[in-house]
Amino acid sequence: GLDENGVFHHQLVAAADTLNAGVHFPDDTAAYDIGYNCLAVNLSDLAAMGATPRWALLSLSLPQADAKWMQQFSAGFRSLAQTHAVALVGGDTTRGPLSISVTVLGCIEPGRQLTRAGAQPGDLLVVSGSTGGAACVLDMLKAGKPVSDRRMLDQPQPRVRLGQCLQGHASA
């Protein structure tokens, strides 16, 4: 929070991920889903710290300029950014194979961040949601197997609020 002098008393935390076509998502993935997903994976990292996301930087490598693709990509990114009050404050574009790098910055009160360093032998391990679902869907798609629901891969749900609620109650 702010003290009476307007001094900001939070720590800045960051998460960064790069997603590459054919590696992290199939080549036929909708642009909307790519935009959504590239922000979601970073928000999940901040959620794991218990942080409140604030700002994002987005760098795109695109094989060619495509206004329709960019509109759909932007709509997916913007949809999730608005849900979590994240402002896109900068980035870069270049020509090359499709690759997206996102850095998300957030805030947390000093000493309240969740870190793996706090885990101890004998601690209770609790997982929210399912683990490995997105990787399973991606593996099935790469193997040419039918997938009835791609949402775990294309539009994962970052648990930002849960991470914030766990501050002071969990160690990692």
Language model regions located:
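Helix-biased detector of long, well-ordered alpha-helical tracts
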Residues: 1-172
